[in-house]
Amino acid sequence: MKESIEVSFEKPKAVICFDDGFHSIVTNAKPILDEHNIPYVIFLNPSFLDQNYFSEPLLSHLIEKTIDHEVIQKTFGNKTMHGGLWNHIRINSSIKQIKLLQELITISDFPKYYLSWNDLESLNDDRVTLANHTSHHLFLSSLSIEEQKSQIMLGHQRL
């Protein structure tokens, strides 16, 4: 026999979620949400928290705002700056993706883009739910079922 659950719709309901753990959550959103005592969820990738891996948005930001195009050419050769460069990176194995992106991080100076493990301490609050968003934010549809499971489980274990 199923138990019935009573739900009240007297107050409007919504869930505030943040994807990927951008650092702006701490600098921009948290003060406002704290002031109004509003709960929220952050979907995190442990590799982003490690500060040694980044995704297409960061790569685009890095290319546009921070580094000399000669650095891109030195690291990746004659790839186009946006989609073509990201497509070049993502067709590689996960390990090679990480190595390529780490090399770019090493030779460039970019602002803090994602939260770090230390930043999570400032989010230690009952209103904040930290949720798994896989370990490395890879395109799951391009992975085998076993690799998908591994990404999900590793993310869960590390968080």
Give each language-model segment a name:
Residues 1-159:
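Catalytic alpha-helical scaffold of carbohydrate-active enzymes acting on polysaccharides/glycoconjugates
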